[in-house]
């Protein structure tokens, strides 16, 4: 869990591992997945949290949008499932999540989550995408 500026709490939780399209028979329940898969998912979660918390223009704009619109009709949902595919070198190939009502916020989050390298390669034969639960919780100061 990461507290940002004392008002916004962002957390990612591993939801499930799922296979690439066309490989449904390879699905693994998270409890049955190899430990290296769970460790890698935690690393991805940590990196996503770091990137969202970064003190830079896009991340600041996204966090401000969440703070301003949370709990409102046009605001972010309380929980968002982010599907992430990673390349063999640890870079984020793509992410997929339901769009927000604000196209700019949607693009900002997509930019943030695709911006870098998580620092490790996915474990051999790890099923993708990773499905990560993204919770936005506000705490009033």
Predicted regions and their residues:
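Non-cytosolic coordination micro-motifs
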Residues: 11
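Charge-biased low-complexity segments
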Residues: 2-6, 17-141
């Amino acid at each position: 869990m990461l507290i940002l500026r004392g008002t916004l709490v962002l957390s990612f939780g591993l939801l499930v591992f799922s296979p690439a399209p066309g490989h449904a028979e390879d699905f693994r329940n998270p409890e049955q997945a190899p430990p290296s898969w769970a460790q890698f998912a935690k690393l991805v979660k940590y990196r996503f949290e770091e990137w969202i918390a970064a003190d830079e223009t896009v991340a600041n704009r996204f966090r401000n949008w969440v703070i301003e619109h949370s709990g409102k009709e046009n605001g972010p949902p309380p929980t968002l499932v982010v599907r992430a595919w990673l390349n063999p070198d640890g870079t984020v190939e793509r992410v997929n999540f339901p769009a927000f009502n604000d196209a700019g916020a949607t693009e900002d989050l997509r930019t943030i989550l695709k911006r870098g390298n998580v620092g490790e390669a996915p474990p051999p034969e790890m099923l993708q995408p990773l499905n990560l639960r993204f919770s936005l919780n506000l705490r009033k100061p």
